[in-house]
Amino acid sequence: MPHLSSRHWRAAVAGAAALALVLTGCTPEDSFTYTAPDQVEQALPEDTVASMQAAVEHAMVKTGATGAIVGVWVPWSGTWVTALGTQSVEDQTAVTTDMSFRIGDVTRIMTCEVLYALADEGKVELDAAVPDYVSGVAKMKDITLLDLCNGTSGVGSSEPTVAGMWLNTPERVWAPLELASFGLGQAPVAPHATYRDSDSGYLLLGLALERASGMSASELIEKYVADPLALENTSLPAPAAAVPGTNPLSGNRLNAIEGGFDCTAPVDITTISSSVGYTDSGAVSTIDELGSFAQAAARQGLREDPAPDQFAAPLPAYADAESWYQATGGAYLVGPLIGQHGSTPGYATAAYADPTTGFTVAVVLNSSTSTSSAVAFLAWELAAIASKAPAAEGQTAPEFGLPFTSEQYFNAIEAIAVCATPPAAE
């Protein structure tokens, strides 16, 4: 849990949801203000909630998750923050909304927030060459820190090579450059003009930011992300293997068996070193705080002057991607939504927000065996359902729409399921 000193920013939390933040500074040089959109202080309509709960329960079955935590904030209609399921098959303790968990690739946005903060302070240049700050990567002399943030460095990803080692030796502490080397060893793609999903790029960016600032990555995320938004349960933990907080959601994985996975006996992997993710996917949070961060980041609310625009130059998320699915700034742009999704051992997490209205969806599943697409599809399915919620009395719904339907992503989850729906009891 980050420590809030008297010189850091303080926040007053208004409204029913933790998203309604008004942040004020303590001294002239530290002054900072972020005001979230007004949020209707009531529950979302029952039929909307019922549809969303059915969507989450469906995704839990198909991914082998025993538990989930969800937050949906529709400023003009209401909120839905809930926990479903249990810690594991063996531990039938009910999941609660205050449990903390690993947020996976949402960490990438935090790392980019730090980059832009240091650039705004004149401590680093966005177009600085990577070797200026990271040793042993001389071949990246034409790659900039902004390329690392935007996913345009061309380097590969380490996870496909080392994921098995993470699961077999969760207590191992990895050096970021060692981990990144597995991605650097892959054939690069053309830099600058092509997005490539690369954990190695964000690992290198973390090292560069540490070198530029003289601070650790944990200290940087505390100073530039957690403290400004008063996120007391959000941090990049120390690398020693540990659970993600004092009240953690259990993280699980499924063992591979012939023809698929053993969905009846998830394996606990709650305790692991945060170094497997570091500044790519190592941070932890709670659902309320994840939603708060996602909304503020989408609105570029952590910066006094959002210029240059962090999300101004998106590229297709992959070859032949839909025109509304792009990536830049450590985030994915999905229609009007900005956010991230991904998995890390034990957890699959997604968080997306609309910068104009403040509409926000955040969700975590306590199983990481399915592809990271599953939790993205769930977040988008929930967003499609919630976007149709009627305005509360006295409110006016904005012009807000998504380029997909909830049915589309219900079917997409079905298509990539790693676990079958259990037979109905006779």
Feature locations, PLM:
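Secretory targeting and sorting signals
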Residues: 1-31
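Primarily hydrophobic membrane-targeting regions of prokaryotic envelope proteins
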Residues: 26, 71-73, 113-120, 200-211
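Structural recognition of the beta-strand scaffold that forms the well-ordered cores
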Residues: 69-71, 102, 147-149, 196, ...
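Short, surface-exposed loop or secondary-structure junction motifs
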Residues: 142-337, 341-343
